[in-house]
């Protein structure tokens, strides 16, 4: 039966600085690198043999996947990168300090932007420092200027169906190294989590989430490999 392993990237510099990161290509901290390697060690210790890695086009996710595979002694695994696995686009909040933004707009409003399912932050103004339209990794793509979790799901799900699911249906073990919200979108889809509950699902950094699937890609079991840093999981079935 197919197995899916979800791995949220390790701590990034802007995680450390408490800034809205979104699509900004921030690298891992030393702690983030250690988290990624630990994730790979856990995968190896569990006897999991990865057949393919999918990741975003953002450095922190790419490096997390590569470091994990290297630590698991599986660096030969094919890797596919796609922007549709990117983190949620935080629009006009991109680059801002979260605490300072809450002081300016109020905690309630910022909480709505961050944690509501279908209310996005203000749009990113074109031509600014964080305008990604001229970044060559997105050449030919129709890019968002802001996203909610709902629109992140709309972006991620077609890629899941067209590119990732066929490998799982073929019985492969797939690792996805990505971001909190793109992984949350996949969890919502697989476990059919209600809209008002998915925003409360937390995915810890660097802790592999192993999901056992049946032939129809319905979850039959799920577990974090590091129990000490595990978060609550949606119910299976």
From Swiss-Prot:
* Annotated positions binding substrate: 8-15, 21-22, 60, 87-90, 98, 114-115, 180-181
Q: Where is the active site?
A: 9 (tele-phosphohistidine intermediate), 87 (proton donor/acceptor)
Query: What does the UniProt keyword field contain?
Result: Gluconeogenesis, Glycolysis, Isomerase
Keyword Isomerase carried by entry: yes
Matching entries from PROSITE patterns are given as: PG_MUTASE
Which reactions does this protein catalyse?
(2R)-2-phosphoglycerate = (2R)-3-phosphoglycerate
What are the cysteine partners in each disulfide bond? Answer: none
Summarize subunit and interaction data from the UniProt record for this chain. Answer: Homodimer.
Task: Report the protein name in the record.
Answer: 2,3-bisphosphoglycerate-dependent phosphoglycerate mutase
Instruction: Provide the organism lineage as a comma list.
Output: Bacteria, Pseudomonadati, Pseudomonadota, Alphaproteobacteria, Caulobacterales
Per UniProt, what is the name of the gene that codes for the protein in this document? gpmA
């Amino acid at each position: 039966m197919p197995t899916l392993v979800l791995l949220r990237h390790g701590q990034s510099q802007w995680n450390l600085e408490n800034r809205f990161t979104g699509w900004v290509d921030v690298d891992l901290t030393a702690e983030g690198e250690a988290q990624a390697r630990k994730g790979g060690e856990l995968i190896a210790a569990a006897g999991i043999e990865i057949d393919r890695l999918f990741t975003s086009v953002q450095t922190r996710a790419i490096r997390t996947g590569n470091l994990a595979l290297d630590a698991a002694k599986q660096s030969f695994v094919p890797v596919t990168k796609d922007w549709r696995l990117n983190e949620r686009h935080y629009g006009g909040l991109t680059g801002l300090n979260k605490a300072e933004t809450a002081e300016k707009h109020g905690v309630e409003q910022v909480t709505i932007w961050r944690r509501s399912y279908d209310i996005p932050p203000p749009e990113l103004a074109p031509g600014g420092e964080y305008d990604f339209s001229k970044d060559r990794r997105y050449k030919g793509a129709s890019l968002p200027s802001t996203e909610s979790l709902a629109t992140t799901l709309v972006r991620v799900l077609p890629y899941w169906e067209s590119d990732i699911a066929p490998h799982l249906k073929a019985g492969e073990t797939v690792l996805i190294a990505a971001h909190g919200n793109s992984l949350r979108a996949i969890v919502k889809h697989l476990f059919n989590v209600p809209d008002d509950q998915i925003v409360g699902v937390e995915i810890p950094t660097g802790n592999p989430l192993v999901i056992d699937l049946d032939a129809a890609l319905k979850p039959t079991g799920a577990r974090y490999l590091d129990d000490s840093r595990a978060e609550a999981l949606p119910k299976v079935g």
